[in-house]
């Protein structure tokens, strides 16, 4: 079965094509992405209207490239990100997917963007066993229990304020690194000393929720430090901030795995491309005797391939197609894999 999927939840226009085998295997055939990030940079963040217009312009060419790369004329299924994400951006991708499904007379599947991030890893590491999922991106930070990609996902905890990726972007702007700041801040942090400045670790007290996160206090602490220490090394500030984020994320994820008796940790989402998060997670998983799975950096950011993968797993588990009147949901919860 050939599955074509469209991703348009934010500022990347993605079209992915995957093949679902009779044995349940999922093979990537094409992964084409067009980004409008440069159009948003001068505004210091994503502008929803610009994102929507960029999707309209990029979707056709991106679709043609994906079909050509995969050598496919017509898929057996069309899927699309139905949420969460920017309302206008979602509408563009969902409307296009429905139109393609109707024109090709094939089933339509409306699937969760966040589940797609988890499913992207399958292309690098094969079938996913029961796992603790740490999903970290610009808009989301969740700790999840993933029994399988075809079953409902259980949320163990999430951020009570800022997402980890949002904190990265805000600190990058504070340091004058521009937008998007995650990659640039990561590079700067590698030049600094993570022990030079110790920043607070939110939600780590004995009375705090063990699987919840908070990054607003860290963000404020960094801002106050920079204001009161104008002579401080930017690299040291970046390293100290990055260490605090990676420390909390990995500590809580490994703890959850131990509490639930799960031996695999999956880290997914845009922040999963961060070098220190990957490094510290590897160290802690090795110490705990756990298996760590993180997709290659390209598959950590938004793309259509991950949506194709998640749709494939839902189909393999027996999910019925979504109706063509299924509405996009900007606030779709992570526990709802599909809008049926």
From Swiss-Prot:
It comes from Mycolicibacterium gilvum (strain PYR-GCK) (Mycobacterium gilvum (strain PYR-GCK)). Its main location: cytoplasm. Its EC number is 2.3.1.234. It comes from the Bacteria. The gene is tsaD. It catalyses: L-threonylcarbamoyladenylate + adenosine(37) in tRNA = N(6)-L-threonylcarbamoyladenosine(37) in tRNA + AMP + H(+). This is tRNA N6-adenosine threonylcarbamoyltransferase. Signal peptide: none annotated. Coiled coil: none annotated. Pfam families: TsaD. GO terms for biological process: tRNA threonylcarbamoyladenosine modification. Its cofactor is Fe(2+).
């Amino acid at each position: 079965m050939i599955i074509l999927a469209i991703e348009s939840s934010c500022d990347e226009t993605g079209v992915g094509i995957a093949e679902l085998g009779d044995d349940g295997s999922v093979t990537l055939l094409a992964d084409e992405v067009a980004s409008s990030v440069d159009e948003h940079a001068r505004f210091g963040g994503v502008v929803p209207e610009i994102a929507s217009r960029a999707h309209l312009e990029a979707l056709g060419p991106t679709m043609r490239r994906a079909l050509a790369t995969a050598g496919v004329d017509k898929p057996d299924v069309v899927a699309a990100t139905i949420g969460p994400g920017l309302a206008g951006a979602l509408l563009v991708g969902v409307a296009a997917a429905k139109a393609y499904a109707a024109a090709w007379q094939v089933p339509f599947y409306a699937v969760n963007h966040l589940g797609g991030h988890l499913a992207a890893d399958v292309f690098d590491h094969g079938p996913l066993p029961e796992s603790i999922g740490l999903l970290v991106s610009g808009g989301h930070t969740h700790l999840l229990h993933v029994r399988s990609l075809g079953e409902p996902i259980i949320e163990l905890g999430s951020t009570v304020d800022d997402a980890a990726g949002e904190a990265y972007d805000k600190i990058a702007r504070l340091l004058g690194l521009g937008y998007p700041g995650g990659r640039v801040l990561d590079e700067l942090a590698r030049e600094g000393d993570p022990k030079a400045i110790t920043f607070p670790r939110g939600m780590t007290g004995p009375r705090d929720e063990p699987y919840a996160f908070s990054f607003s206090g860290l963000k404020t602490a960094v801002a106050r430090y920079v204001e009161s220490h104008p002579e401080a090394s930017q690299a040291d500030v970046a390293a100290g901030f990055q260490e605090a984020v990676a420390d909390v994320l990995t500590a809580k994820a490994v703890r959850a795995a131990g509490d639930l008796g799960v031996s695999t940790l999956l880290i997914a989402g845009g922040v999963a491309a961060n070098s220190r998060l990957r490094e510290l997670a590897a160290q802690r998983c090795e110490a705990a005797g756990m298996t760590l799975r993180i997709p290659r950096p390209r598959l950590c950011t938004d793309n259509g391939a991950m949506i194709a993968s998640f749709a494939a797993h839902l189909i393999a588990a027996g999910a019925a197609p979504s109706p063509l009147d299924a509405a996009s949901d900007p606030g779709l919860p992570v526990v709802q894999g599909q809008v049926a």
